[in-house]
Amino acid sequence: MFRLKKYISPYLGYMVLTLLIKLLGTVTELMIPELMETILDDVVPSKSWNQIYLYGGAMLLCAVGCLVFNIWANRMSAISSGKITLALRHDLFAKLGRLSARQMDKLTIPSAESRLTSDTYNVNQLLARLQRIGIRAPILLVGGIFMMLRMDWLLALILIALLPIIALVVYFVTRKSLPLYTQQQTVLDKVVRTVQENITGIRVIKALSKTDYEKKRFHSVNDQLTHIDQKAGSITAITNPCATWTLNIGLTLVVVIGAFRVNSGGCQPGVIVAFLQYFTMILNAMLGITRIFVMFSKGEASARRVADVLELPEDLETQPGTEPEANSPYIEFRNVSFSYTGIGKNLENLSFTLEKGQTLGILGSIGSGKSTILALLLRLYDPDEGQILIDGQDIRTIPYEQLRSRFGTVFQNDFIMEGSIADNIRFFRDIPDQRLEKAAQDAQAEFIASKEGGMEADVQVRGNNLSGGQKQRLLIARALAADPDILILDDASSALDYRTDAQLRRALREHYRHTTTILVAQRVSSLRHADLILMLHDGTVIGAGNHETLMATCEEYAFLAQTQMGEAEEVC
């Protein structure tokens, strides 16, 4: 929790005030048994109604004060812990957005989700309970013992002798449960990942009749989580029964020994009644302290996981800039090599240049490095070797916002949000309606006009009420809407028929002459008009040139082109 002190510090004064109010409520609560003892042992024998009303009124005032102060403090603790958690979630979300793709690969999306939700919730609960019980329980414990020592030191020693037993139980439980709660959050990441995969791929799972298999896979991780939760719960479950049993033993001894002392004149009956009340307060205080330790185990484990992400060094910092190289190509890959894992190259010694307004086509088998080129150009990763330049400037020296504002991008299985068609194309950018219409027209998204409401027609989560081709055209319209300098289409026309694909390419050639376009596709027909085509295999370029050059010099390209041309006639 110490690692999150920057989030707690701004509210430290507010939290101290909360604790002071809680202290007032606790002190007024401690006064009630002593007032009762005075009434029973001094006021009642005197038969003075005025004193009975006076001390009775004082007890009532203390009870009301205790209620008001505790409610006030509890509300304040909820406000401060809520604001701290709000800032924590905000910074954690922003930090996740700044992490490189490589760091996110290591962290995993399910782990990021559970840290942003479950872990921050646990931190919130810990902060709130520390303010509510953290001052009240110790003050009740210490104050109760002090008041008991004032009344009868011999009876008080019985309780004091039992406290080390409870302290040992709390120490044992905390030591054993903290690693288990850390492990529990890690396994929770697996559960979230499994659920996420199943929900995302539910149609494929049903189509392949793999529902039973996925049930077994979920039951496996769910059983693992349940086992750890039960193990942690069985350890923490020791605390309350042990504390209650120990204190009840003490309570029994106090009643028995107290009865002998009353009979012998060693103390008054009111003292025994007050002792029983203080004993109940101390019992509740000890149980509260044990709950704090249990909550601390869970909250501390979560705080560590959150801090681990917040303290991650950002490995894609903008580097000091240099003067752009004169007379440089618009885009240049210069001897670029890259590996996702450090074992084997995903791209090896890749070099090519592209002038502004030209089109690059990338073709290759699965895993050949097509999408890796795009990820490097967008600087989702940095290359292990070599340079990537735009307008003669190394992209590592260009600020993120400035770099990525140049791009219009459509990835495979890209994000479609719930909302209107216009919202999805605009995507939180300041783009006029006329530009949205133009982008939709160029993307061949004529289906929009047939929808009820047109641009304001509803789109379901992940575009579930759209066909595959409609989704792709909607995403292409989004990429075109901002009139980007560089347009990236990663297999963005795979669901389009040949005619629509050809019309799309014609619109790009006619209306986006100054836009540099990079196409990744499986169809030769989608790339044949490109100024440069790269044929990749296992991260290496095995052919480079225009369509005619590759037909003459690259056997793999020629074979693929002839096979596809036999299936469909090119529509220009």
Please give the residue ranges for each predicted region:
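ABC-type nucleotide-binding domain
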Residues: 326-572
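Helix-loop-helix
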Residues: 47-51, 147-161, 231-305, 309-310
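Pre-NBD coupling/linker segments of ABC/ABC-like ATPases
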Residues: 314-326
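Membrane-integrated ABC transporters
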Residues: 1-32, 36, 44-60, 73-77, ...
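Juxtamembrane helix-loop junctions of ABC transporter transmembrane domains
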Residues: 20-21, 25-41, 62-109, 113, ...
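An intracellular "coupling" helix at the cytosolic face of ABC transporter transmembrane type-1 domains
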Residues: 10-12, 77, 98-102, 118-131, ...
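Helix-loop junctions and hydrophobic alpha-helical segments within the transmembrane domains
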Residues: 92, 96, 205, 306, ...
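Transmembrane helices of ABC transporter permease
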Residues: 10, 14-27, 66-68, 128-183, ...
